[in-house]
Regions:
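Membrane-embedded helix-loop-helix hairpins and adjacent transmembrane boundary segments
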Residues: 1-502
C-alpha cells in the first residue's frame, strides 16, 4: 500500500521528536557514568517504561501477532511465560542488583559488576562476559534492524536495502548523541505509543468484524483449533514457550534499567507500573493476531500481504482500518518498539567495548570525555556490523530474537540471579555458569534435541555449574562475604519516611 502524505508527515514528526530528545539529553551528559547509566537518576515511571520498551522489540508488534495469526491462541503461552518471568525478575533481581552494583565499585556494566562482585583479579570474567554481550547482542541488534527495515519497506515502498539504512539511521543518531538518558527518555515516549497502538487496534478490528461474539464465531469457523490453548502442543512445546520467561534474568539492556534507578526503594513502584504496561501490551499483541484471523477471513481480497508474511498483520490492519493520520501514529509504534530496543542494545554493546575492554585493558587512565567519545564511536561500529548481518531480507525476526534471548538468558541469567541471592557463590562458579550456559544454548540450538527451547537446558546446566564449582573451590573471602552482607542489609532496609526525605 502506497504511503500517504499524512502518514509520511507523522513518521517524520515522530523521528524528529526522538532526535530532539537526543540533543536535550546530550546537554545533561557530563561524563561516562551519565552516558552509560544516566548517573543512576531514573525515577520509577521512567525506570518502568524504559525497561518495558527496551524489552519489547519489534517482535511485540510483528513477531507475536504474526505467530498468533498463523497458529491461533495457543501461541499466547509465550506471553504467559514472559509475564511470569518479568514479574519474578522485578521481584527478586531488580532491587538487589541496584544495590549490589553500587556496593561493587559502583559498577556501570554487568562485566564490571561480575569483576567486582567476585574479586576477579584475572579479569577473565570481564572478558568473557563482554564477548558474550558482543556476540549475542549483535545478533539481537540485527533482528531489530530487520524489523525496522520491513516497516519502511512496507510503508514507504522502498527497496529492502534502502529501508535497512533508513530504519536504523534515527536510532543510531539519538543514541550516539544522548546516550543513556536519551535512550531512557525516548523509551518512555515510545512505551506510551506502543500501549496506545496495542489497545486501540484490536478494539477497532473487533468492531469492524461485528463485535466480539461475531469475531469469535468467524475464528472458530475458520478452524476450531484457533481457540484451543493446547492446539498441536505437547508438554515440551508448552514448556518451551513458557521458558522464554527465564530469559529476563540475563538481559543486559533490561538489567541496566534496574542499575540506573535512583533508589532500590523506587523499584517497587516501577514494578507495578511496568507489569501493568506489559500485561496490557502483550494482551493487545495477542488480540491483534487473534482477531486479525477474523478480519482477513471476512476480507480475503486484502489478505494477500499477510498470507505471504504473517508478521505484517499489524501493519496491514493499521493501514486498512484507520485514516492516514492515525495509521501513521500506529505504524510509528512499530518503529518505537524497534528503536527503543535497538538503542538500548547498541548502548550496552558500546559500554561493553568502552568500559570493559578499552578502559580496562588499553587506556586505564582515559578521561571521562575520551570515554564518552569512544562510546559514541562504538555505537556506530556495532550498528554497522548489525546492519551487515541484517542484509538478508529473508531473516525472520522471531528466530533471531529467540536465539539471542536464549543466549543471554542462559549465559547471564543464573549468574545474575545467584550473585544477588547466594553469598557462597564464587568466581569459578560464575565462570562455569556463564560458559556452560552459553555453550549449551549454542550446541542445543544446532542439534534441536527433544524439540526443547535451548534456554531451558542452558539455564538448568548453567545453574548446576554455578553451585558445583562454587562448592568445590575455596569459600569467598571475608571481604567479599562482608560486602554481600552489607549490600543485602541495605536492600532490606526500610525506605526513608517523608519526614526524613523532606
Amino acid at each position: 500500500m502506497a504511503i500517504s502524505t499524512p502518514m509520511l508527515v507523522t513518521f517524520c514528526v515522530y523521528i524528529f521528536g526522538m532526535i530532539l530528545i537526543g540533543f536535550i539529553a546530550w546537554r545533561s551528559t557530563k561524563n561516562f557514568d551519565d552516558y552509560i547509566l544516566g548517573g543512576r537518576s531514573l525515577g520509577p515511571f521512567v525506570t518502568a517504561l524504559s525497561a518495558g520498551a527496551s524489552d519489547m522489540s519489534g517482535w511485540l508488534l510483528m513477531g507475536l501477532p504474526g505467530a498468533v495469526f498463523l497458529s491461533g491462541i495457543s501461541e499466547s503461552w509465550i506471553a504467559i511465560g514472559l509475564t511470569l518471568g518479568a514479574w519474578i525478575n522485578w521481584k527478586l533481581v531488580a532491587g538487589r542488583l541496584r544495590v549490589h552494583t553500587e556496593y561493587n565499585n559502583n559498577a556501570l556494566t554487568l562485566p564490571d559488576y561480575f569483576t567486582g562482585r567476585f574479586e576477579d583479579k584475572s579479569r577473565i570474567l570481564r572478558i568473557i562476559s563482554a564477548l558474550v554481550i558482543l556476540l549475542f547482542f549483535t545478533i539481537y541488534c540485527a533482528s531489530g534492524i530487520v524489523a525496522g527495515a520491513r516497516l519502511f519497506e512496507s510503508t514507504f515502498g522502498m527497496s529492502y536495502e534502502t529501508a535497512l539504512w533508513a530504519g536504523a539511521a534515527a536510532t543510531i543518531l539519538y543514541t550516539f548523541i544522548g546516550g543513556f538518558l536519551a535512550v531512557s527518555w525516548t523509551d518512555t515516549v515510545q512505551a506510551s505509543l506502543m500501549i496506545f497502538a496495542l489497545i486501540l487496534t484490536p478494539v477497532i478490528v473487533i468492531i469492524s468484524v461485528g463485535g466480539f461474539g461475531d469475531s469469535l464465531e468467524v475464528i472458530k469457523q475458520k478452524s476450531i483449533e484457533n481457540v484451543d490453548m493446547l492446539k498441536g502442543l505437547n508438554f515440551v512445546a508448552i514448556i518451551s514457550l513458557m521458558g522464554w520467561g527465564l530469559g529476563y534474568f540475563g538481559q543486559p539492556h533490561i538489567l541496566a534499567r534496574f542499575m540506573a534507578a535512583d533508589s532500590h526503594h523506587s523499584i517497587v513502584h516501577a514494578r507495578r507500573i511496568s507489569m501493568t504496561w506489559m500485561i496490557l501490551c502483550l494482551a493487545g499483541a495477542v488480540a491483534v493476531g487473534f482477531f486479525g484471523i477474523a478480519y482477513f477471513n471476512e476480507h480475503p481480497a486484502v489478505a494477500g500481504a499477510v498470507n505471504q508474511n504473517a508478521e505484517r498483520v499489524f501493519i496491514e490492519l493499521a493501514q486498512i482500518l484507520f485514516n492516514p493520520w492515525i495509521a501513521g501514529i500506529l505504524l510509528s509504534a512499530i518503529l518505537a518498539a524497534v528503536m527503543s530496543t535497538l538503542s538500548c542494545q547498541l548502548l550496552v554493546c558500546s559500554s561493553a567495548i568502552t568500559e570493559d575492554l578499552y578502559k580496562a585493558f588499553l587506556r586505564k587512565q582515559a578521561s571521562q570525555k575520551e570515554l564518552v567519545w569512544v562510546g559514541r564511536v562504538m555505537v556506530l561500529v556495532v550498528a554497522l556490523v548489525a546492519i551487515a548481518l541484517a542484509a538478508n531480507p529473508e531473516n525472520r525476526v522471531l528466530g533471531l530474537v529467540s536465539y539471542a534471548w536464549a543466549g543471554f538468558g542462559a549465559a547471564f541469567g543464573p549468574v545474575v540471579l545467584f550473585s544477588v541471592m547466594w553469598s557462597r557463590m564464587t568466581r569459578n562458579g560464575a565462570l562455569a555458569g556463564m560458559i556452560i550456559g552459553a555453550l549449551t544454548v549454542i550446541v542445543w540450538k544446532q542439534f534441536g534435541w527433544l524439540g526443547l527451547y535451548e534456554i531451558i537446558p542452558g539455564f538448568i546446566f548453567g545453574s548446576i555449574g554455578i553451585v558445583v564449582f562454587s562448592l568445590l573451590g575455596k569459600a569467598p573471602s571475608a571481604a567479599m562475604q562482608k560486602r554481600f552482607a552489607d549490600a543485602d542489609a541495605h536492600y532490606h532496609s526500610a525506605p526513608p519516611s517523608r519526614l526524613q526525605e523532606g
